Structure formats: C-alpha cells, structure tokens
Amino acid sequence: MKLSLVAAMLLLLSAARAEEEDKKEDVGTVVGIDLGTTYSCVGVFKNGRVEIIANDQGNRITPPYVAFTPEGERLIGDAAKNQLTSNPENTVFDAKRLIGRTWNDPSVQQDIKFLPFKVVEKKTKPYIQVDIGGGQTKTFAPEEISAMVLTKMKETAEAYLGKKVTHAVVTVPAYFNDAQRQATKDAGTIAGLNVMRIINEPTAAAIAYGLDKREGEKNILVFDLGGGTFDVSLLTIDNGVFEVVATNGDTHLGGEDFDQRVMEHFIKLYKKKTGKDVRKDNRAVQKLRREVEKAKRALSSQHQARIEIESFYEGEDFSETLTRAKFEELNMDLFRSTMKPVQKVLEDSDLKKSDIDEIVLVGGSTRIPKIQQLVKEFFNGKEPSRGINPDEAVAYGAAVQAGVLSGDQDTGDLALLDVCPLTLGIETVGGVMTKLIPRNTVVPTKKSQIFSTASDNQPTVTIKVYEGERPLTKDNHLLGTFDLTGIPPAPRGVPQIEVTFEIDVNGILRVTAEDKGTGNKNKITITNDQNRLTPEEIERMVNDAEKFAEEDKKLKERIDTRNELESYAYSLKNQIGDKEKLGGKLSSEDKETMEKAVEEKIEWLESHQDADIEDFKAKKKELEEIVQPIISKLYGSAGPPPTGEEDTAEKDEL
C-alpha cells in the first residue's frame, strides 16, 4: 500500500514540479519562515543548500517582539525586546499565544494576567491595545502583530538576497487548529506575503534531519518543545518521502510556562521576605522575567545561577540563587506531562518504543537536561540524535519545502505526507458522530459517504460538521452547520445525499452535500469565522476518548467522598439538634465539642468544594475521631454507636 502511495505521491510531485516550472518566474525565491512564540527564524534554499539568514543585529534568530516608543517609533525584533523593561506597556510579544483564539479561551484569560500590555475583547477575540506615541492609543489584532514580525523576517531575507520576496512557506505547531492556521495565513497576507504552504513544525524539523538520509525506511520521533508550544510527531522517512504517521501535542506548553513558574516562586518569596507585592509594578515583573529566562538558560550547563536585579522594586535590589534542582521541582509536573503525547503517538501508530530508529529533539526547551533525561528514560536509555540545531531546524525544513515550491531541482525528490490531528464527521440520527475522516489521516484527502432522510417527505437535511473523538456529537466540537434544501418528496431512506469532506494541504476543511437525485448542491468552508476550537478543547478531545473512563471514575470518587463528608456532617448536625436523638442524651460539654467540630467541617466544605479525595477523607477522619469516642461513651456497650450515616444510606443526593 505504502509503495503505491509513494509512487502516486512522486507522480503528483513530478506533475506539481511541471506546474511549478511554469510559475517559477512569478514566485521568485520562496523563503521558509519559522514563526515561533519566543523566536522566529528565516531560511532560503540557495545553491543546493539551506542558508539561515542573520538579521540586522547579526542574530540568526529574532525575538517576535513589537514595541511602540513614546516618540512614535515602531521597533521589531531585538530592538523591541531590549527595551521591554523600560516600556513594558507598549512592548508586545506572545502574539502566537493569542492568534486564532477566542476571548473566552481559558488560556487567553490565563495569559493576559501575566502580559504587561493591555489585551481587550473585540468581536469575541483578544486584541492588543497600546500607546503608539503622542498619546495615541491603537488596537491591533494578534494577526497584525504577527504580520509585523513576518515583515521583519521578509526584510531580513530581502537584505540578504538583494531582491524582493513575495512568497513564503510558514510553519505552525502540528496541533494548531483550523482557526489558528487560517489566522497565520492572514498574517502573511497582511505582511505582503503569499503563504504558499502552511507546514507543521515537527514535519519541517524531520526534513532538516532526514534530507540527506537515504539509507532505507526509518521511524523518526520528533519531540518539539519550544517557547510556547509542544508537538510530538512520528514519521517514517524513506528516500525523500516523509510520511507523518501520528501527531499529538499541547499548543500551550513551553519555555514561557517554565519561566512563569519560577517567576511566581520568586514573587512569593520576595513578598514573604519584604511584605511587598511586586505584581503591581510592571517594570519589576518584566525585569524578573528577563533575568529568570537568563538563569534558566544558564542552568542547562551549570547547577546554579544567581539572579541579581539592581533597583528591582521601590529602589531595593533583588538577589537570589536558583538551583537546577529547584527549577526542576517547580516544573516537574509540566516536564512529566510531555511524556503523555509521546505515549499517545506510539499507540496511534501501533509501534513499540524499540521500533523508533531516531529521536529528534527540536526547540530551545529541549536543552533542559531534565527534559533530555525524561526522553532518554522513556525510550529505555536510547540517546536522542544531536545532529541538528534545535533553534534552526524548523526554519531549515521550511526553506527546503520553499525550495521545492519554487521549483529548485537541487532539493531532489521530496514528498511530504502530513496528517489531520482530529477525527472529522457529521451528526446522524440520535446525535451519533458518524466519522468520515479519522484522526491521523494523511492530507490532502477527500472522503464521500451516502446518507438519507430520517422521515417521509423530508424537504431539507441539516448537515452538522463536528470534530473530535467521542461517539456522540454532544461531546465533540461543532465546526459548522448548513442546510441542503429542495429534496423531492419521498419515503424516508429513499433520497441519496452524498456528503464529501475535503482537506487541503494546509489542513483547511471544505464540506459539500449533494442530492444525487436532483444534483442540488451546497457547501461550507470551515474557516476562521466558524469559531473553531480552542487548543484546550483539541487537547481534551484527542485524549478524551481513552481518558474519559478513567477521569469519570476519579471525578465520581471525589464527588462521592465529598458527599460522604457532607452527609456525615449534616446528619450529625441534625441529630445533635434533635432532642429525641443525640441532642437529648449528650452532656452540654460534649454537645458543644461536637457542634464546634461539625460546624468547622461544614464551613471548610463550603470554601473547599474542589479539594482532593485525600482532603475529604482526612476531614471525615478528623470528625470521626472527635465524635466517635463521645458516642461510644454515651452508648457504652449497648450495640454499635450511630455513625451519622444511617439516614443517607443508598440515597444519591440530587
């Protein structure tokens, strides 16, 4: 099957090359851009090899920061980042964490607490509000900020090439949803670039690793942990054909989250020592952000780092030590969470750990020794490959793909087969999710299926398109809805309605429905304005199907334990207040002791609804230890004492 697929792909490729030959003059030199969260990078395929291009400061990677000075000047890149601490309210970064997301997205709400600039709601999306100089306030969409960064990368390439650049290949996290991909393409358009292809970051990194590897089929696992996003992709590489078998990840996990944990630790420590809350001072927080990031980098090669900040807050200096052990302790849950997607891609691709030929680490955060150790331990001591630069690999792969699209013969026969990260389908009778394209299907792809009407003489069918892994649509995410009308009267089950799903190379979905009897057609393109998924929902869905049973069990256990404590406390309260029961038998001293203990637990419950199972059990045990000796003393040996739970046995509360 794979051979025929490869043959078909190579035929497609040669046809595409012939087509590209005609267009070659139009596109000029196509550049490859890695539009990262914390660094961006641009490369070009020239004279048979990839050149990663240095910016005007001589750096091969550029921070995607945009700043507006009080004088009305706009700075992009290193110059913008360098003045962050003196102008935090008007220095914008992390646009990639906002792009293509809705305002209500929990991660947006979480992020804006820590961003020094103002983020406001506009058209249900997050927009950035800054003072652009001269007392003028302006609001930008995240796409506009990303466009400014893309413009900087474009100009960097133009300065090196000595000519205009109009076409580009731009990378996105493999786990970016449709809205985020579309928004990234829009950013390119705003920057005056024709984004010929959106490719997935781990796939681009695999090209960088495997371009010159021609020794037969290999299974490659790409572990891509950057500043803001995390992807794992499993590919097979075979003589220039790169086939993604499975992908997984988290579009909101990276180096910035590790920095945030350390910052929170020091902010608390500073408050404990001085009683002062530095959160009120934007500049102080940004100074701390800068120094924490430096310390984190230092800890990749040494065991401790000093953090010294002069005139940190209210004229006082800041001086603390961060050890590697403390850094790891603060982030251990995040580090360990990176192993789940690795396990998932192995399961999805039906491969064992021993089947992986190479592990490729990409992204600056893979320099963290603990991350390297966890990956190595997961693969039973196998050493990851160290052959590629983790900062430049993605731009390198994008530049190779750009070379292919510009018709450069030196790229050799390169074919990319990527996948869609989630199952796509439509709702059928009873709210059932009927799957048309399973997750990890190679794209581009097209799939059709015949459906029919559910009742006699039904003139209209409503097509509801969903994304997700659960068997019922109510648990999945609605992408869009459209109607196919004008179906001629007929008994149920007779009309033939063909629904076609088509995903293009950029991962954008188009759905068509056709009444085969009349030739009536209707279609919908799922794009940015369809209110696509938040990454949290994507992450949830992919893992939900398998995790749900386990999660539900844990949740039920927690609720049951909470209810046990609540029922026990209230049952005791009622008995103490009832003269016919305990109330009439207790001494006033014992009664007061029990009342106090019960009230204490009821109050605790009201403010700790979300506590852990262990906490609920511990509180119940505390209450029992106070109550049972009193009741035992009261009842003596006349049978078992009441536990306070007789009234509630076998009754679930509503």
Curated annotation (Swiss-Prot):
EC nos: 3.6.4.10
Signal peptide: 1-18
Ways its activity is controlled: The chaperone activity is regulated by ATP-induced allosteric coupling of the nucleotide-binding (NBD) and substrate-binding (SBD) domains. In the ADP-bound and nucleotide-free (apo) states, the two domains have little interaction. In contrast, in the ATP-bound state the two domains are tightly coupled, which results in drastically accelerated kinetics in both binding and release of polypeptide substrates. J domain-containing co-chaperones (DNAJB9/ERdj4 or DNAJC10/ERdj5) stimulate the ATPase activity and are required for efficient substrate recognition by HSPA5/BiP.
Region feature Disordered, mapped onto this chain: 633-654
Cross-link position per record: Glycyl lysine isopeptide (Lys-Gly) (interchain with G-Cter in SUMO1): 353
Coiled coil: none
Modified residues (N6-succinyllysine): 447
Annotated crosslink Glycyl lysine isopeptide (Lys-Gly) (interchain with G-Cter in SUMO2) location: 352
EC main group: hydrolase
Positions where 3'-nitrotyrosine occurs in the chain: 160
Renumbered residue ranges of the record's region Required for interaction with ELAPOR1: 1-80
Modified residues (N6,N6,N6-trimethyllysine): 585
Protein name: Endoplasmic reticulum chaperone BiP
Organism of this sequence: Pongo abelii (Sumatran orangutan)
